[in-house]
Amino acid sequence: MATRLQFENNCEVGVFSKLTNAYCLVAIGGSENFYSAFESELADVIPIVKTSIGGTRIIGRLCAGNKNGLLVPHTTTDQELQHLRNSLPDQVVVQRIDERLSALGNCIACNDYVALAHTDLDKETEEIIADVLGVEVFRQTIAGNILVGSYCALSNKGGMVHPHTSVEDLEELSTLLQVPLVAGTVNRGSEVIAAGMTVNDWTSFCGSDTTATELSVIDSIFKLREAQPSSIVDEMRKSLIDTYV
């Protein structure tokens, strides 16, 4: 089930947080309500880490990550990098990237298996994405927008993309990503999907302006009604143990 919340009267919750199946990052300095909303849903299951990136709080737009890794921009300080490495699970690789397009969250949309990337990212960056996140990388646009990370929210169960995405594009993207997709909005009509929400395989957090209709679409496409965190995390633990054995 999706949870509605705000970050200091701001509905762009995907700007101030990053949620994956292995960890959750939240911006430092938000109201306690913001942090406790994440805590009540996630605390028993995955670590919730308060952090800044490059001295800013817009962490969701600056980093990209999944259960395998976390990519942060070159503006990230050594102290922040060390804090993230200390706080995240041991199997999560934290990598700082020397990439000109430093708002990595705007340029990369990914789940645990595939990533959509900005068409102008360096070849080297593309290789790092594939290597650190353990994903197949596709350079794409979404409804003509190059900022794929802004206009797409993705989990292993489904995805939501820019509302003006054509049926042909939806089908093509869905085939690439191997998950069902829907064109939709958050925060009462906002097209910038990833800024207004953050999602993993069992829960989602959306801006408080998100309407009941938008919420039901989110619950439906990401299959949140049937999701159980414990079973998903157990599966992940099994797969991790298998890789170590």
Swiss-Prot record:
Keyword presence, Protein biosynthesis: yes
Keyword entries, A-Z: Cytoplasm, Initiation factor, Nucleus, Protein biosynthesis, Ribosome biogenesis
Pfam family, one: eIF-6
Cellular localization per UniProt: Cytoplasm; Nucleus, Nucleolus
PANTHER family reported in the protein's UniProt record: TRANSLATION INITIATION FACTOR 6 (PTHR10784)
Family in the record: Belongs to the eIF-6 family.
Name of this protein: Eukaryotic translation initiation factor 6-2
Species, as recorded: Arabidopsis thaliana (Mouse-ear cress)
